[in-house]
């Protein structure tokens, strides 16, 4: 801010490096570890690998104060009153939240007990303060308190004030006021002795995400996992849902399917509903354990109350196998070092215990469609992952990773690296890439004044959000989505076989390849049969009509 510009790439990488030097000041006196770390940082500068994008965003004071901010995403069941306040805390810190509103989870929530009195509650001007406001309201309606909070927002800094620790601008108190109003409305509709439904829990979390989105830290990424027979959740994005319940746009929804118990007729019935919906909703989440979940993009297999730990390999410009193995080696170095960040606060102790238990890695590859990587050559790299992870973990006195390899959608990383996204083909030879931006941000005002053709209002929140449209031309020789859906799915299956499964050590589910399938009108039956036959080769899948269906302001749009 003092220089009135944004950080340069080298400055961002240096900030990340300095954070690690502080965190591991004793451990990095080991020459072997320091040499590996410095070589890994050099690879980040060259954009051959990337650490966690949240680590790059918040490296320094923000992560030093709250180590959960180093992690992109997490997962929890909604089975406690603390689920709601923890969601606010995590989302405000930039961490995406996967959550389960399956019947057996929400049934553990207390019955509604409406408060009879009020008392003043001063909301602190901090992430913890906003989360505490959610906690106080939920507690007052669930028998933990006999008084309802009368919120005083006078301590919250005004809209537009600079945020020192994490960067960005303060949203002011209004988004929190609106959020609390909507949550109280849901709670007030209930009668004493009733419990929240899955859809009501989901809506509460989506209203929380709306407040976070207005804060401009990061788009509040969420995925809701719901029971197979939950018709309310299945249909909550049907029709013109965005007119009356625009908050539901804050989360992707996926139906939980036990791959060992589902019958073909049940799956085909669900498939027909997805086909008719034409919106990419709901997605499919195949699992071996109904309590396990995933992150919003579904590439990481997570126990309840566990964080993702991501890093990335740029697969678009790999020269040969030796080059690939070097990138794998140094991505493993950084990922293992990131796994040591477990000094959490505000969250329940179970978060630290579970995250330390598996010390997960999520080593992904992006730009796969830019380089036509041969998956048969990937298996040798897993020996390097295991050796380096064990070496670094022993030096840091943490556990070795239970699961190590994934392919994430790589929305941000692919933009940084100039590659295709994860496993996906490029959208087309020429297309628009869209992203959301707050209207209070300096970049919005600049583009709106100088390049207004790049800007349009966000249909969900036109008063505060906008869409930026970037025209993209892809590299020659790249795979585009003109390939058939089955060709794409076969690539998913091969990378699952040769990249994901060899990286699995323990756990009910393996990691996953985050995949959105675009289906042409004549491909629906073939895709249905492929998924059914290969349901052991995927955890999370999203299905979208080739023409975009009813997806409003989709992230990729054709240009002619």
Language-model features: where?
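Extended catalytic cores of very large enzyme megasubunits
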Residues: 1-560
